[in-house]
A protein has these predicted regions:
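A generic structural signal for short, non-catalytic loop/turn and secondary-structure boundary residues
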Residues: 39, 84, 96, 146-149
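Charged, gly/pro-rich active-site loop segments
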Residues: 1-24, 99-176
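A generic structural signal for nonpolar/aromatic side chains embedded in well-ordered alpha-helices
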Residues: 29, 83, 122-123
Length: 176
């Protein structure tokens, strides 16, 4: 798959503002190691819905691969249980030099060995020595407060995004 291009771009700011180009957040997300973030990660937050309808948010590390975002989660975490019941979710992130971006879409676990290997290589570049296992990853250590290994890899396919920064606000829609 190639990187998605918006099918619709809408300026949400003042009339005199111009729409923010999708290339601004895309270029940061697709960079091998984001500027000023040598580990490759920058603040990102996953928003899901609990079975009772209440919202849930948690910090995650994301990686861009082949047009989608990927993140890891243990099978018994609240986010994994929420996504099993309802894959609709958001990822919000503060990108270096803006704009701040919120993406809306769906997340599902991935078992494809080729994708696991490709994303595993990206994660290892950040210094986390993950190894691919059947359907996920393991490592000698994990995130603080997280489930022990193995961790599932989730693919987040976004359908819409909103970017907001000092120069205005823009909504992008994608046909995916």
């Amino acid at each position: 798959m190639t990187d998605p291009a918006p099918i619709e771009t809408t300026n949400l700011g003042r009339a005199e503002d111009t729409a923010i180009a999708w290339s601004r957040p895309r270029d940061v997300l697709t960079a091998p190691s984001p500027p000023d973030h040598p580990g490759g990660y920058f603040p990102s937050y996953l928003g899901t819905v609990r079975p009772d309808g209440r919202p849930h948010a948690t910090g995650i590390g994301v990686r861009w691969h082949d047009g989608d975002l990927y993140f890891l989660s243990g099978p018994s975490t609240r986010k994994s249980r929420n996504l099993a019941a309802n894959p609709a979710c958001t990822i919000a992130m503060r990108l270096p030099d803006g704009p701040d971006v919120v993406l809306g879409g769906d997340a599902a676990p991935i078992d494809d060995p080729a994708i696991l290997e490709a994303v595993g290589a990206l994660v290892r570049q950040s210094g986390w020595p993950v190894e691919v296992t059947a359907g996920g990853f393991t490592a000698p250590f994990g995130p603080r407060g997280g489930d022990p290994p193995p961790w599932r890899l989730y693919r987040f396919v976004f359908h819409a995004a909103i970017g907001q920064g000092g120069e205005g606000a823009t909504r992008w829609r994608f046909a995916r």
